[in-house]
Amino acid sequence: MPQALPFPIRKECPPGACECGRDELLDAWDKAPDDTDIRVLRLTREQEKVLIERIESIATYEELGHIKQRILEQLGVRLTITPSAHGVSTVMGLSIKLVEQPGLCRRTRENLPAAVRRCFRNNPDIVYALLNSRDLLGIEPA
């Protein structure tokens, strides 16, 4: 018998519309709840909208770091932002991705990086601070 989930989770996407592995993640959690991280399922569509608004309202590089850390802590999802090896002349020169993992919806993997790009377009100082935070070899400090 399936265990009750400790929190409300994201509704499943229509069949064929997403390859997130939500059902497989839930099955794995059902078999071994202590070994399976289901935090990513906490991000419902409504909460995703709130998170997108929050990301778009980021005003400083420090806020960006805080949001990245909170996403990792609360959802177990890593947001990576790396400049192109060929240089960055626009926001499109940055690679902004959510690391793929079971349960992470395709729409979320597209929507959150798009929100970060919109934030960067509205606040180019964040991009400058991001680029300045890396050393000459392009390595982010630990």
Regions found by a protein language model. Name each.
Residues 1-142:
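Extreme N-terminal regulatory/targeting segments of RNA polymerase sigma factors
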